[in-house]
Design a protein with these regions (language model features):
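Sec-dependent N-terminal signal peptides
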Residues: 6-15
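Boundary at the C-terminal end of the N-terminal hydrophobic targeting segment
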Residues: 19-22
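Extended, loop-rich substrate-binding clefts of extracytoplasmic carbohydrate-active enzymes
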Residues: 29-31, 37-43, 99-148, 164-167, ...
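Acidic-aromatic substrate-binding/catalytic surfaces of carbohydrate-active enzymes
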Residues: 50-111
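A contiguous, surface-exposed recognition patch within enzymatic or periplasmic domains that forms
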Residues: 51, 58-60, 65-72, 78-79, ...
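Hydrophobic core residues within well-ordered beta-strands of beta-rich domains
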Residues: 138, 151-153, 283
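Short peripheral tails and domain-boundary helices/loops at the edges of structured domains
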Residues: 303-313
Length: 313
């Protein structure tokens, strides 16, 4: 869940932000507020900037040298994330919300530039540079929890400006537009723009079977704190803070799905609450990722919902 807390900056961060006084940053477990996590994390450095985080037959690869992106997430060596070579079409990234504050392209310091790297208490910690434009720093913490077989990702947004700001966290994960199914707990009638994408209702949730169109499409929805994606071999489930309809940033939403034109890629997006930050304050927001083998038919079913609910309980 999102927590508002005072900022403490490590010496490594100080090298990147000249005018900030060095302070000790709290431990990752203290930041997340989940010190009861049972970690079984194996972190391996693959090259100068890439790190593998392993737990059992699951492996996640993160590139600290290029925006701290998640490049890969596999179960039993089967990939779930888009591996497209084109810019802005692969991996999983993190932005600040609302988008209208920066429009396009994504803020380079968060999405493209190198992050510093630390490893502490079985957690891989990445710190971005401060954005020249927005004056935020992004911190990403990657760990695993063997209690529920999840990858625990905690994002922090740090206000290094001299003024009070309002901001929300935003995770964007790209998957191939192939034979996939996206579903979440929200009424079809509440998905906006109404009728833009072919959502159907079954078993009390909304379902979208990946399709193709000549234009880009994006919807907003007020979900119940989870978002799932099913393909022919895998089930990806994300669990995050459930928001009320008034919690998101202006013109944003708890759950968003973006489908790029043609049969290229789809973005699974979730956001946290729009939060006021005083100078040198930060917010933290945690997303748990679950990836399971699943060769059941790619279609809406009671069994699939039961599997998701068992995972996120």
């Amino acid at each position: 869940m999102m927590q508002l807390k005072p900022l403490f900056i490590s010496l490594m961060c100080l090298v990147q932000a000249h005018a900030v006084q060095a302070r000790e940053y709290p431990s990752p477990s203290a930041l997340r507020g989940d010190a009861d996590i049972q970690k079984e994390t194996l972190i391996k450095q693959l090259d100068d900037s890439k790190y593998a985080i392993e737990m059992g037959d699951l492996i996640m690869v993160v590139d600290a040298g290029h925006g701290g992106k998640i490049l890969s997430f596999k179960c039993q060596d089967v990939e779930v994330i888009s591996q497209s070579p084109m810019r802005e079409t692969f991996g999983s990234t993190f932005w600040t919300s609302p988008q209208k504050e920066w429009n396009w392209p994504p803020v380079q310091e968060y999405d493209k530039m190198p992050y510093s790297v630390e490893e502490e208490e079985g957690t891989l910690i990445l710190n971005s540079q401060v954005s020249d434009r927005l004056k935020y720093r992004i911190r990403k913490e990657f760990a695993t929890d063997k209690k529920d077989n999840s990858f625990v990702i905690t994002y922090s947004i740090i206000n290094e400006s001299g003024v009070v700001r309002r901001v929300a966290p935003w995770e964007i994960t790209r998957v191939p537009n192939e034979d996939g199914l996206i579903f979440f707990d929200a009424p079809v009638a509440g998905i906006t723009p109404v009728g833009l994408m072919a959502f159907t209702s079954a078993e009390g949730v909304s379902w979208y079977r990946a399709d193709a169109a000549d234009s880009n499409r994006k919807i907003n929805a007020d979900g119940k704190g989870w978002l799932a994606y099913k393909n022919q071999h895998l089930l990806l489930v994300k669990k995050f803070q459930d928001l009320t309809p008034t919690d998101p940033a202006p013109d944003e939403a708890e759950i968003q799905v973006y489908v790029n034109r043609g049969k290229t890629y789809i973005e699974l997006e979730s956001q946290g609450a729009y939060t006021e930050l005083k100078p040198m304050e930060s917010l933290s927001w945690t997303v748990r990722w679950y990836l399971l083998p699943d060769s059941s038919p790619v279609e809406a079913s009671k069994q699939l919902i039961q599997k998701v609910k068992k995972v996120i309980k």
